[in-house]
Amino acid sequence: MALGAIGDGRLLLLLVGLLSASGPSPTLAIHVYTPREVYGTVGSHVTLSCSFWSSEWISEDISYTWHFQAEGSRDSISIFHYGKGQPYIDDVGSFKERMEWVGNPRRKDGSIVIHNLDYTDNGTFTCDVKNPPDIVGKSSQVTLYVLEKVPTRYGVVLGSIIGGVLLLVALLVAVVYLVRFCWLRRQAVLQRRLSAMEKGKLQRSAKDASKRSRQPPVLYAMLDHSRSAKAAAEKKSKGAPGEARKDKK
């Protein structure tokens, strides 16, 4: 009897452990995403986007709920609800005539648009999504700032500065490459001219050498001719006295 009771107790503990292990896992909780802050100007419109991630398929019973907490207020009111395939705009608050549903549940999009913004719209908007059976999760909040003029964000200014610096660097690099290209091209032209001049000098020197190689025979012929003429003159001068003697006799 005692052994049977102990065995039944162990079986009960085992069943409890299995049931607890098969319970909902925190890793399967739904995750909702919205931007941290959104800016708008008085009289314009703004889109408050809301998306989510779920481990389950998109359910027919999916629901979106938007709440609004005005700046400086502790109370939060429901301003919009989507369920059973139909959007509902709550009568509470000043958004009834200025709100538009632009979401698409099949694309996990629960965005809304608020038209004709006013300073009273400053505050925090909360988006909550349920996708049965995935209903455990944390909602997401976005803060709306309504101003006379949309301020230039720090990121935009920084991006503009970085873009300007990169553009300046690109221009400097382009100028350097252009100057280098022009310099190399000029050097190539000068090199071709020098090569042509050197080639012309070589050709002229070759012609001069060929002329000089042809001059020695002519000089030798002129020397031989001058020698022959000199010898003939000497013979003539030697023979002239003898003829003179014959004439005297």
UniProtKB/Swiss-Prot annotation:
GO biological process, one term: cell aggregation
Keywords for the protein's UniProt record, in alphabetical order: Cell membrane, Disulfide bond, Glycoprotein, Immunoglobulin domain, Membrane, Phosphoprotein, Signal, Transmembrane, Transmembrane helix
CDD domains: IgV_P0 (cd05879)
UniProt xrefs under Pfam families: Myelin-PO_C, V-set
Positions of the UniProt region annotated as Disordered: 227-249
Gene Ontology cellular-component annotations: plasma membrane
Lineage top rank: taxon: Eukaryota
Keyword Membrane assigned: yes
Spans within the Extracellular topological domain: 30-153
Subcellular localization: Cell membrane
Listed InterPro entries: Ig-like_dom, Ig-like_dom_sf, Ig-like_fold, Ig_sub, Ig_V-set, Myelin_P0-rel, Myelin_P0_CS, Myelin_P0_Ig-like
Signal peptide extent: 1-29
Gene3D superfamilies: Immunoglobulins
Membrane topology listed for this record: Single-pass type I membrane protein
Tissue occurrence: Found only in peripheral nervous system Schwann cells.
Disulfide bonds: 50-127
UniProt KW Hydrolase keyword: no
Glycosylated residues (UniProt): 122
Domain Ig-like V-type: 30-143
TM annotation in the entry: 154-179
Residue intervals annotated with topology Cytoplasmic: 180-249
Function: Is an adhesion molecule necessary for normal myelination in the peripheral nervous system. It mediates adhesion between adjacent myelin wraps and ultimately drives myelin compaction.
PANTHER family: MYELIN P0 RELATED, MYELIN PROTEIN P0
Similarity-based family: Belongs to the myelin P0 protein family.
Name of the protein described by the UniProt record: Myelin protein P0
Lineage summary: Eukaryota, Metazoa, Chordata, Craniata, Vertebrata
Gene behind the chain: MPZ
